[in-house]
């Protein structure tokens, strides 16, 4: 009987291969259908030629790149120690699947423009399935790569739960130490002279600042509230993996607007959407992810969304533009401007 680890490995590999191959086949079939309309409708030669080329591409890439890399990483596990900061599987998905899919999605639109000779007779919106399938497959592959390091069965606490529990212990320990220090000070009234203990107002230490600047997080030990407060780290992987790419998903959906895909605005929207997806190549705990999130997504999206709003109106949500602007400004302020003297004054008030 197969072990649970082997079953998990087989299921994960099959899901990843499906996410790697299916988007390319779907996009290429859509391109073949659009291209066939430019030819004789009774003949399917061009259609089947393009479909067969897409199948051949997936087969060649899988046999020459995907399978060898997968086998090498599985057999030579020590190679993971030499790979720092990025993930080979996600690199293959982005370069070999996502990039061709985006290119042929643009090609489908161009072929439709060639068929109709005018943009006025084009469909009102682009089909959402192909592009959504590409991004969903990429996110699913990312989730699988994260779940490899977690067991499928059993219960695992969320990291945030552990942080709250640790913070509570630290707060209890701090209060106990303060009470003990107050007792020692009261027991020794013969302290140092005022000239030795006096400090100027600007020389207050960090311990003088109140520790509890906000409301405390509740903790439920039993009952229905404990059941409702359960958070498993594996479920949160699914949640945050989709939330992380919601901005890119919204930007890609803008490409389906008739005022975008019927004009040259389609190119910058797809280009910067693909650039933002490059962040998925890096490991989840990479220290460069915050900076890359600004450089590859938020900052470019500010200019793209602002240009779209100025040229075409509010076809992209203003909330998305506000998010990109605020995230970019907050990153620059808290990471760089606060290092200057004018922004580095110590705050005595917790409010």
Swiss-Prot record:
It is a multi-pass membrane protein. The chain crosses the membrane at residues 9-29, 49-69, 88-108, 121-141, 264-284, 301-321. Glycans are attached at residue 116. Its main location: membrane. Disulfide bonds: none annotated. InterPro entries: Uncharacterised_FAM23-like_TM. Intestine. GO terms for cellular component: membrane. It is found in: Membrane. Keywords: Glycoprotein, Membrane, Transmembrane, Transmembrane helix. The keyword Transmembrane applies. The keyword Nuclease does not apply. PANTHER family: TRANSMEMBRANE PROTEIN 236 (PTHR31453:SF2). Belongs to the TMEM236 family. This is Transmembrane protein 236. It comes from Oryctolagus cuniculus (Rabbit).
